[in-house]
Curated annotation (Swiss-Prot):
Belongs to the bacterial ribosomal protein bS16 family. InterPro entries: Ribosomal_bS16 (IPR000307), Ribosomal_bS16_dom_sf (IPR023803). Keywords: Ribonucleoprotein, Ribosomal protein. This is Small ribosomal subunit protein bS16. The gene is rpsP.
Amino acid sequence: MALKIRLRQQGRKNHVVYRLVLADVESPRDGKYIELLGWYDPHSEQNYQLKSERIFYWLNQGAELTEKAGALVKQGAPGVYAELMAKKVARRAVVRQKRRAYRQRLAARKAEAAAK
């Protein structure tokens, strides 16, 4: 069961508000969700409220942010977003290091085979 943190449309005609929810990838946009993580109202002054500790928890459990939800989290909970980006950079560095080591082993094997 893949999970995403995404925006769920609410409200009425010409006054849409959104809920930031954790939902299964296969559930419809306005369908069933697992947990409410915040809301966003583009029409009011104080236009969002987020549960940053729950967002952080679910991101650590493997949930993914959609593009628009990521922008909202970046604005509303910059600490959570910064930590998420730091983890991504660290993962990329590990992959890069493994790839570099593999290429070095491969080059050594080729050099050894050419020397024979």
